[in-house]
């Protein structure tokens, strides 16, 4: 164990379970990577357990999907570091994704394409956009026609659906100014 994880270096050797270091914020990247792998396996097992329950009760014409999210900067981009999406999606019938992208002059198309390519590769088939923004806060407000452009971009990248968060605008709480498809 000490040899495999390089714990002999910098006097990190573990001789007793009571000496085992806290992996949060550890300087030992081998140990940190193994712990992250363990955490991702828990997500996969949990989703598989849920899918098994649904599979037991669903009809033959129904499918199982999961809203796989992506890492976030100011929008969705790149792999979700806390989930092994490829492993976790094996128990799903159809891949689902949650893609948020900037609007107005900030929209490049890269966010839709990168996340769409990842989503399509999960099951090597088309996928579902289970959540994306209809309208947003002031910096996210789309130009006229831009929502249609974004929807067509999702479909062109392999999505069989474009579902919006929210249908109607929120009237209270933290997302009061996050607008829906119906802006009332």
Predicted ranges, named:
Residues 60, 64-184:
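Hydrophobic targeting/anchoring helices
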Residues 1-113:
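Polysaccharide-binding and catalytic clefts of secreted carbohydrate-active enzymes
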């Amino acid at each position: 164990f000490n040899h495999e994880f390089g714990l002999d270096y910098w006097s990190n050797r573990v001789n007793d379970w009571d000496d085992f270091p806290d992996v949060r914020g550890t300087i030992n990247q081998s140990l940190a990577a193994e712990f992250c792998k363990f955490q991702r396996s828990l997500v996969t097992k949990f989703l598989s357990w849920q899918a098994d329950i649904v599979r037991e009760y669903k009809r033959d014409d129904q499918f199982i999907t999961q809203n796989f999210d992506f890492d976030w900067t100011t929008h969705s981009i790149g792999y979700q570091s806390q989930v092994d999406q490829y492993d976790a999606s094996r128990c799903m019938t159809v891949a689902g994704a949650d893609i948020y992208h900037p609007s107005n002059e900030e929209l490049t198309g890269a966010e839709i394409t990168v996340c769409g390519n990842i989503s399509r590769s999960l099951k090597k088939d088309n996928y579902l956009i289970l959540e994306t923004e209809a309208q947003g806060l002031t910096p996210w407000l789309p130009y006229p026609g831009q929502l249609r452009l974004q929807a067509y971009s999702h479909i062109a990248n392999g999505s069989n659906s474009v579902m919006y968060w929210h249908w109607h605008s929120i009237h209270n709480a933290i997302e009061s100014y996050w607008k829906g498809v119906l802006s009332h």
